Amino acid sequence: MIPKEKWKQYGLPNMEVKGIVIHNTNNQRASAADLEKWMIENNTSQGTHFIVDHNEVRQVMPLDWSVWNTGGGMDFGNLHCISIEICSNPNNRLYLQGQLKAIDLIESLMHEFNLTKYDIYFHRDFNNNVNCPSQILSMYGNKKNFLSMIKEKR
């Protein structure tokens, strides 16, 4: 978890969760632990709530804090969405293991916060100038195909 004294650089308190934003890291070799360490050691304002790789799911920010993750300032994605970074990996088998962990996390969060597939966004939904989540888009072609992997628990 990011130290509490750094939370203000990543977002704002008292977030009301209304969605989930999916990202892929563009660092092909970094693990979830590597990315958490980078967030702690650097002064970036870009944040996320979860980082997922083939080994683990790491929660790095509390879910009642927004995080700057869509590049749109005070937009819906930054203020009301849980951000999940899925670690990219050139080894498709390892990447898919991480993606399955992320899907389990997404399904759990959907249930916890009473969300539907319509409440799941890609980073590019907020900024057409980014190709994120790039590995998901490369594998599935579009959001609809990826969302077909997710089961709603009602």
Where are these regions (language model features)?
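A broadly tuned preference for mixed-charge, low-complexity surface segments
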Residues: 44, 63-80, 104-113, 134-140
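Basic/polar, cationic surfaces and motifs that engage anionic cell-wall
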Residues: 4, 8-16, 89-154
